[in-house]
Amino acid sequence: MAAPGARRPLLLLLLAGLAHSAPALFEVKDNNGTACIMASFSASFLTTYDAGHVSKVSNMTLPASAEVLKNSSSCGEKNASEPTLAITFGEGYLLKLTFTKNTTRYSVQHMYFTYNLSDTQFFPNASSKGPDTVDSTTDIKADINKTYRCVSDIRVYMKNVTIVLWDATIQAYLPSSNFSKEETRCPQDQPSPTTGPPSPSPPLVPTNPSVSKYNVTGDNGTCLLASMALQLNITYMKKDNTTVTRAFNINPSDKYSGTCGAQLVTLKVGNKSRVLELQFGMNATSSLFFLQGVQLNMTLPDAIEPTFSTSNYSLKALQASVGNSYKCNSEEHIFVSKALALNVFSVQVQAFRVESDRFGSVEECVQDGNNMLIPIAVGGALAGLVLIVLIAYLIGRKRSHAGYQTI
């Protein structure tokens, strides 16, 4: 989904270097030549891909040559299809937006991106070849008969891809063949209160979460074994326009389910007010598994937008060799988006290959290794002190015996 703010320091660095070019204009018209979708925006695409035994990041912007792909775009047919804007560019690249509406609002319900790993200009030395398609929901929405307007960056996180739109003007279900004068501005563009920026409320932190145990089984046996305590750190705007950060614990009593696949293992944990989905992927080349995706759908009754949703499918956390288990006693913070951080405590997890429903050999996190340095250093210092005292004692004893020698 769309979420303001960067996911990782690497993304911040790359995004800072983007040249914000002038936005392009795209139109979809019906059979009578009347526009039903208009969109003007600039865009960039950051894609993580495997190149041998390393991961690389490709960075491209929407070129001026991008154009509407007419045979994949439509105004939608009543009760049959959704209005769709498809934009093609480069050698096999496609950005597609599908729209939906209710009685008061319309939205970009889904965004799809197809990229070409055979394009050596942007994906040199890519391990895989050919096209790949990823998708995500978005937070792009506006009132009916109003134009959606967002000057600020809009980030949409997909599997291995982050799409950034800026200087965006979008409208579907047009009442005329032009943008409406009235606008719905995105939350990122909203001005700060004239009384000065409010101090964020201190995090409302509950007690540390309890450890929960999860076991996901498929046709071929157990594909996920996990023991961990999870906590959600969510930042959102309340109805009184103040920003708060709250912590919500995932409880052992929450129900869970999951799926087993050859390349993807999922775990869903939830209750009546929230569903958290964790996706574990696998790099077949390096034989590593890792947490690659997090999606959260939750209800926040005191928020301006009570329905909270965010996701990120470009993560690489909780990583270990397939057949082994990842273990970390230290608290870990996984930044999913600007609005969500996932705190993980006392974790041990193993995905894809689990034998006899037991954890395999342990691969410890770096944090636990660093924590061991302190007791080792203290132990070394104490051993050195004992050695010095022992040497001093032996020297003193030797001198004492020398004073009683027979003349």
Swiss-Prot record:
Domain of life: Eukaryota
Signal peptide positions on this chain: 1-21
Topology of the protein relative to the lipid bilayer: Single-pass type I membrane protein
GO molecular function: enzyme binding; ion channel inhibitor activity; protein domain specific binding
Localization per Swiss-Prot or TrEMBL: Lysosome membrane; Endosome membrane; Late endosome membrane; Cell membrane
Region (Second lumenal domain): 220-371
Transmembrane segments: 372-395
PTM annotation, UniProt: O- and N-glycosylated; some of the N-glycans attached to LAMP-1 are polylactosaminoglycans.
Cystines in this chain: 36-75, 150-186, 223-260, 328-365
Region (Disordered): 180-211
Repressor listed as a keyword: no
PANTHER family: LYSOSOME-ASSOCIATED MEMBRANE GLYCOPROTEIN, LYSOSOME-ASSOCIATED MEMBRANE GLYCOPROTEIN 5
Biological role: Lysosomal membrane glycoprotein which plays an important role in lysosome biogenesis, lysosomal pH regulation, autophagy and cholesterol homeostasis. Acts as an important regulator of lysosomal lumen pH regulation by acting as a direct inhibitor of the proton channel TMEM175, facilitating lysosomal acidification for optimal hydrolase activity. Also plays an important role in NK-cells cytotoxicity. Mechanistically, participates in cytotoxic granule movement to the cell surface and perforin trafficking to the lytic granule.
Protein name from the UniProt record: Lysosome-associated membrane glycoprotein 1
Organism phylogeny: Eukaryota, Metazoa, Chordata, Craniata, Vertebrata
